[in-house]
Amino acid sequence: MDTISKVIGEGTYGCIHSPSLFCQGSTQQEINKISKLMTTEEATKEMKEYVIIDNADRAQNFYLGKPTKCKLDKNPKNMKAISKCINIGDEVLIHYDDYSLLIMDNGGIDLDKFSKNVEGWADTTENKKKMEMFWLEAHRILLGLKVFLDNGIIHNDMKQQNIVYNEAENRLNFIDFGLMSSKTKVEASLRNSDFWLAI
């Protein structure tokens, strides 16, 4: 049975639903996946960024793997879920054909939500163990930043909402590579800038 997808995140360029919205022509919902709804142009750009990340992290130690891109299906369940997108919902419902989905693994909740959950935890041995496991896993973020650095990658949107944590698997991952750039491009733009603090 299909489930109405819920908005689990929203930013400037996209709206994220879990479970995934339906791809065009699909009759089956990806229950264990999430979808990022965005303009086809932005989705195409972001897919190119994933090629760079995948080359740097072939074993997918620091991100969830390359998503798949598909056109958005115009069905009532999608439309109902999209109407809950605050930033882009109305625009999508008018210009449906201009939007696509990136379908990806669900990496858990972002660190902002996780920290709010933790605030409500009781002071128990079990919860202390959970936090210890989280902090042991947090080294993955530092290792991932080193991989980015070694490969000349700048994420450009590093914040708690762009790191997700799957508590059941005790796994942290970077997400949202839409603003990613290369160190070479950033250095070139700084050199060509007339802003006195650029370099």
List PLM regions with ranges:
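Conserved N-terminal boundary motif of the eukaryotic protein kinase catalytic domain
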Residues: M1-V7
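ATP-binding glycine-rich loop module of kinase domains
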Residues: E10-S83, D90
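Conserved structural core of kinase catalytic domains
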Residues: Q60-M133, V186
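Conserved hydrophobic alpha-helix
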Residues: I141-F148
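Catalytic-loop of the protein kinase fold
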Residues: F148-N166
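C-lobe/activation-segment region of protein kinase-like
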Residues: N170-I199
